[in-house]
Amino acid sequence: MSKKQTKDKANGAKATKTIALNKRARHEYHLEERYEAGLALQGWEVKAIRAGRANIVDGYAYVRSGEIYLIGAQITPLIQASTHTVPVERRDRKLLLHRAEIDKVLTRVEREGYTLVPTALYWSSNKVKLEIALAKGKQNHDKRDAAKDRDWQRDKQRVMRRHNRDA
């Protein structure tokens, strides 16, 4: 190990590596609070995630009997997946959060009409973590406004670059 890596670990820095992002969530929802949750995975799922075979775009989280589960997320098994279990790509996966966080999320989802959307899947010190966000759906006019604003920002940057280059 190099000196730099040793120094980073001594300072308590956590190495994170993104596995999958849900960019569609930012487009379709107003994202508010974000939470980091662990995932209860089987062995073949961890190997498949290491190989980069995870997709969280179609996934969402819901509360069932006081626990939060991720459904719709796809982890495609490797060809040499486990022989003693049948791999299911889109099974319900339990999310690991503190009880206080679960209770807080539960009240927001049930009373205020929020949805739990996965936004990122990443490694955090050899553990797979999922970032979930409390979200409210956007209307079509909100999406159009966001697109107009994005185009305006791009045009503004283009004009500023051209102006600075000419000056």
UniProtKB/Swiss-Prot annotation:
Keyword Flavoprotein appears in the UniProt entry? no
Domain of life, per lineage = Bacteria
Q: Where is this region: Disordered?
A: 139-167
Q: Name one GO biological process term.
A: trans-translation
| GO molecular function ontology, one term from the record | RNA binding
Instruction: Give the Basic and acidic residues compositional bias ranges.
Output: 139-158
Spell out the subcellular localization from the entry: Cytoplasm
Could you list this entry's UniProt keywords, alphabetically sorted: Cytoplasm, RNA-binding
A Pfam family cross-referenced in the UniProt record is SmpB
Q: Which Gene3D superfamilies match?
A: 2.40.280.10
InterPro entries referenced in this protein's UniProt entry, alphabetically: SmpB (IPR023620), SsrA-bd_prot (IPR000037), SsrA-bd_prot_CS (IPR020081)
Q: Report the GO terms under cellular component.
A: cytosol
Principal location: cytoplasm
User: Its biological function?
Assistant: Required for rescue of stalled ribosomes mediated by trans-translation. Binds to transfer-messenger RNA (tmRNA), required for stable association of tmRNA with ribosomes. tmRNA and SmpB together mimic tRNA shape, replacing the anticodon stem-loop with SmpB. tmRNA is encoded by the ssrA gene; the 2 termini fold to resemble tRNA(Ala) and it encodes a 'tag peptide', a short internal open reading frame. During trans-translation Ala-aminoacylated tmRNA acts like a tRNA, entering the A-site of stalled ribosomes, displacing the stalled mRNA.
Q: Give the family per the record.
A: Belongs to the SmpB family.
- Protein name as it appears in the record: SsrA-binding protein
Could you tell me which species this protein originates from? Xanthomonas euvesicatoria pv. vesicatoria (strain 85-10)
